[in-house]
Amino acid sequence: GLIVFGVFGMALCQYTYFRSIALAGAGIATVLQYLAPSMIIIYLLVRYGKRPSKGEMVSVILALVGAICLMGNGDGLSIESFPMAVLVWGLLSAVGVAVYSISPVDLLYKYGTLPIVGFGMLISGIVAAILFHQPNSYAVWDVWTVIGCFNVIFLGTIVSFNAYLEGVKRIGAVPGSILSSIEPISAAFFGWAFLGNEFSLLGLIGMAMIIATVVIIAWDRQRT
């Protein structure tokens, strides 16, 4: 379970997501990754016969459409020069999210979130070092490079993975993966705060849809 989580969950998701961004930009890569909740629902239905609730189905649709609207807020989502290869990488990133949402659940209950995430990162790091070893680096290391690496490693990986999987342990893979769709809102907010990006009506509609998923999931859990 831990090997599957580290290799086909964390490592696969991280590499394919950044690969998608490199090919088509963050907008399309993010939207494709948010197909993961649908994949999780299909897997649980086929494997365990677990039918999704009406709230979960509505939330999946709202989260995906909301992400599309939000990523299309400015110039973030464009299919004019859309390489078909990004479809493969984007779907693989969604598979990675589905795998790391489902595979470690029993381990999380048994050992806790932090040890599982730590060993998962260790395994994925070893795999990455073997497959993508680069003895020579051409990166220009300055203060901004260090800050960027810190943000990606600590905030974007360590904190986010631990918070996400703790949520999955508490409420389950489907609602946890749906609620993670709040990520595009934070990206849009920081883009507005630090980069001067503006919000369009489409972007605000997308935000409202994503926030609605939080309300629906909370209401759905109170009913069950």
Per-region residue spans from a language model:
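Hydrophobic/small/kink-forming positions within alpha-helical transmembrane segments
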Residues: 7-11, 15, 37-42, 68, ...
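Loop-to-transmembrane-helix transition segments
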Residues: 1-16, 60, 84-95, 140-159, ...
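Hydrophobic transmembrane alpha-helices of multi-pass small-molecule transport proteins
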Residues: 52-74, 128, 181, 190, ...
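Hydrophobic/aromatic residues within transmembrane alpha-helices
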Residues: 20, 32-33, 46-52, 107, ...
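Specific transmembrane alpha-helical segments of multi-pass solute transporters/efflux pumps
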Residues: 1-27, 33, 69, 153-171
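Membrane-interface helix termini and inter-helical loops of multi-pass transporters
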Residues: 19-22, 71-83, 132-149, 192-201
